[in-house]
């Protein structure tokens, strides 16, 4: 019995460390200078109007989010965390299209809100997949509330520090989760593909104008949408194809 208790305590240590990192990183935010929204953020490279749609490519390139979100909701909508995840992806398509139709801080709120919910849902789902469904269920609602509050705080104070945490903390936490906890399901490669595609999306976003200047065909921001939606598709494929990973008898005994 003592050995089993010690084993369970050992398994919980990485999760406790992750929660500690979460609290510590949040506690450091007030020590950082406020981050205001850059007014030039809305000046995207490709502002062409086509078929009566302003900023055409930045608007219509959100369609893949809607498609991935629709399939995800259809197949996995009965699971709470995955429902939030794919609803967030689905609504990101509409929120981002709404924003790019008329880019300003007011419409940007509706672009960022579903994205913030998606970031926190991805973190929750990863905890469910690598740690336990119970741990994920405990984290889901507090993290979603934090996501919503981060956007409200930005609107009230023009301070993006907390929203920045919501967006980038999963980038730190997910690798730690995947290293600290063994896979309970197959398909880890899909998570790696999703991470690579998201990194590519951020790169496209940064080089928006530079990419558009080469031929004036598509801008970096449009390509960012395609890459980010592809990352969401990789996560969808993970859930479509994953299978439980068999564990050795000794490990199975240790986990009970």
Walk through the language-model features, giving the residues of each.
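Early transmembrane hairpin module of multi-pass membrane proteins
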Residues: 2-139, 149-152, 156-159, 185-247
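Active-site rim beta-loop-alpha module in soluble metabolic enzymes
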Residues: 152-185
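Core segments of transmembrane alpha-helices
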Residues: 62-70, 144, 167-174
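Short, highly charged, low-complexity non-transmembrane loops/tails of multi-pass membrane proteins
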Residues: 246-256
């Amino acid at each position: 019995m003592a050995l089993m208790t010690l084993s369970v305590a050992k398994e919980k240590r990485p999760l406790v460390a992750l929660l500690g990192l979460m609290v510590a990183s949040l506690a450091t935010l007030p020590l950082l200078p406020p981050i205001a929204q850059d007014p030039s953020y809305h000046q995207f490279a490709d502002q062409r109007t086509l078929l009566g749609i302003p900023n055409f490519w930045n608007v219509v390139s959100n369609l893949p989010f809607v498609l991935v979100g629709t399939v995800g909701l259809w197949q996995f909508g009965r699971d709470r965390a995955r429902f939030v995840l794919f609803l967030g992806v689905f609504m990101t398509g509409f929120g981002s299209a709404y924003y790019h139709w008329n880019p300003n801080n007011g419409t940007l709120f509706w672009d960022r809100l579903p994205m913030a919910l998606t970031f926190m849902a991805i973190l929750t789902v990863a905890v469910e997949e690598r740690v336990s469904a119970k741990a994920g269920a405990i984290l889901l609602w507090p993290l979603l509330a934090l996501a919503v509050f981060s956007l409200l705080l930005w609107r009230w104070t023009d301070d993006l520090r907390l929203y920045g945490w919501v967006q980038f903390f999963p980038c730190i936490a997910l690798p730690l989760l995947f290293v600290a906890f063994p896979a309970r399901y197959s398909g880890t490669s899909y998570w790696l593909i999703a991470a690579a595609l998201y990194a590519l999306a951020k790169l496209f976003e940064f080089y928006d104008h530079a990419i558009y200047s080469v031929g004036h065909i598509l801008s970096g921001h449009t390509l960012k949408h395609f890459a980010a939606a592809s990352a969401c598709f990789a996560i969808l494929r993970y859930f479509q194809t994953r299978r439980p990973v068999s564990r050795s008898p000794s490990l199975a005994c240790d986990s009970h």
